[in-house]
Amino acid sequence: MVHSLNKLYIAMKRIYLLFTIISAILVTSCSEEAVFSSSPDYRLEFSSDTISFDTLFTTVGSPTATFVVRNRNSKSLRISSVQLSGGEKSPFNILVDGQYGSYMHDLEVRSKDSIYVLASVCLERNSSDSPVAVRDTLMFNLESGLQQAVILEAHGIDVVFMRGVNIENDTILPAGRYLVYDSLAVSSGATLGISSGTTLYFHDKAFMRVDGTLNAQGTVDSPILFRGDRTDNMFSYLPYDRIPGQWDGIVISSSSSNNVLRHCDIHSANYGIRVDKGVADDERILIESSKLHNFHGNALELSMARAVVVNSLLANSQGNCVKVCGGDVRFIHCTIANFYVWKVRDVALSLHNSIEGEPAPLENALFANCIIAGSKDDEVMGYNTAFADSVDCAFNYRFENSFINTPDVADTNFVNVVYDRPDSDFFGKLNFRTIDNEIFLYDFHIAAECAARGVASGYYLDVAPFDVDGNPRPATAADAGCYNFVEIKEE
């Protein structure tokens, strides 16, 4: 019993000694941290002296920006106040070390320590056709009398909000900016016209469904843009607009026909345009001088459709840039190129004569004056399904005067074709002006050394007399693809 009490006494004594040492250390540390300076020579350091918000939609709150206020000095500093120069009328919202508002006071930044500032903004409508700049200053007033400032700036644009809109009568959208939440639908029997120069911003998971007819007529100088609504950056070098999956995509349903898209740019969605199986004899869609690029799924999927695609770019998809499942399709002067690197991907072009195991006769698939390229050794795949019960399901295709990344084959359906030979070092990148997989920047104008130059036939000149940029094509020896080669002039 006595022995146990002695052990308990010794243990308690050790605990008391340890507590005394820790208390002394804490008191010493607190005493050192509590030494504040009122000298104007001691300054704060900001991780950024200007906080810039990318172009924002008015009345819609911005993402939150964060910056750090550091005290690298040997003594602590007191901040008498932090305030927005615009006061309570400022559109900017500030949170400083847990305090929220346009005016905050009695803040401390200990020596060798830091605090965080969170900033956001919600801009009022400005009734301007161009982005309107808004600026304010966040003032830090130190106990010493020293003033330091961080600039806050943003640019706001007005948009027309469309939330779950269903177009039931013939409608023309005037040129402008539209922000789509949930969906934009066109009912059967109705036609939606979209004026040149229009931009449709789609929120996350928002989509467009056409049961009637879509008539989107842009121009070279005023294209129609379909894109996501994120205008900020993931990283300093990477806008969200270059990242696939920002919105859902466009569905042309089975009841829809006579759709026309000219000079449209559709990008960075889960899929581009999906044309569902419809009435066999209907002209389902004409795509001309347009760009579909950067998708999680397929850029263009055609199921038992009569479709014509002219002078267009279809690029960079985790699925296929073009997937054709039966029907009658013609591609003239198109660039179909896949350099998608976000995940393991499929080939640029795939042809099928079945849909979910059922026959889907491929009556005709013509690719004339086209480029089919990418980083794989073979970017063209055909799936000619053999059906039971002696079902003869058509699988007809033809490639003419085109530049194709596929092995040289003894096939009479390949006429005047030049075969690409991607090397192991550059993987087909040298065919185009810019293929930058580091910052996900792509320019599919053909390079001077690209073997697609002079490959095209003049037979289709009346179909595509100008390239997608509006440059006239020569009557003979034009280039394959949607871009005719133009020498870059050095300034």
Residue ranges and their predicted role:
Residues 69-73:
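Asparagine-centered strand-capping/turn motif at beta-strand->loop junctions
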Residues 2-7, 12-15:
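Positively charged n-region of N-terminal signal peptides that target proteins for export
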